[in-house]
Every structure is written in C-alpha cells, then in structure tokens.
Amino acid sequence: MFLGTYTPKLDDKGRLTLPAKFRDALAGGLMVTKSQDHSLAVYPRAEFEKLARRASQASRSNPEARAFLRNLAAATDEQHPDAQGRITLSADHRRYASLSKECVVIGSVDYLEIWDAAAWQEYQQAHEENFSAATDETLRDII
C-alpha cells in the first residue's frame, strides 16, 4: 500500500528518486502517466495493466471512452528504477505537471502521485477546509 508524503528533488536530467519504502513494490517496473489536477500518477506495472484492461473494455463507439483510452496510452511511459531508485520523467510529463526541482510524492493507496511542491501546497490549501465534509459525503457508505 502506498501511503505518506515525501519530498524528493528532481535533478537536472529529469530524474526523481522514489521513496525507499516503495522501491520493492515498484521493482518489477512501473508506469508513469498524466493524472488529474496536473499531477503524475505512478502505478506498479501490474496495477496499470488492470486499469488499462478495464479502460479498453469500454465501448469504442463512445467518443469519451475512445478519448480516455487514447490519452491514457499516449501519456504513459514505462520506467524501471535505476540502482539508486531513480526514474527519469519525460519532458512532456515534467511540463504537464509544471515540475520544478522541488517535488512531492504522495501515496494514494494503490499508486503514487508526483506533484510540484508549490502546486501541492496550493491544492492542499484550497481543499483543506472541505476535507471533513468530503469525508462525510464521499465515505458515508464505506466507513
């Protein structure tokens, strides 16, 4: 399970060191793709394959489903962490997420998110007040 908040630096070559506690779960390969709110999502390869299979089962006659599948496939990059646990983020991914040297990696249970540190701080400030209400509304039937 991916949990917690980490603050690795992005180096000049576009490499980001993944948190050590997640490296074993990602050692078999990982998929980096664009996500909501101009962040990046990092999935273990097996989890991403499940997501892609589910997405590909949608009707190809549905324009939204086709667009989603196209964007998902086109925006995804397979990575294998190096010996230091670093992955190289593509220029397109860095641009999409407006990544500076200061990054934040957050656990999102079954995947990781990569954010620019300033964007993550802004996101948190904008959503902090709604956290309790969202918890009540969203999780009412689960918890």
Curated annotation (Swiss-Prot):
Residues 5-47, 76-119 form the SpoVT-AbrB domain. Keywords: Cytoplasm, DNA-binding, Repeat, Transcription, Transcription regulation. It holds the Pfam family MraZ. InterPro entries: MraZ, MraZ_C, MraZ_dom, MraZ_N, MraZ_sf, SpoVT-AbrB_dom, SpoVT-AbrB_sf. HAMAP family: MraZ. Forms oligomers. This is Transcriptional regulator MraZ. It comes from Mycobacterium sp. (strain KMS). The gene is mraZ.
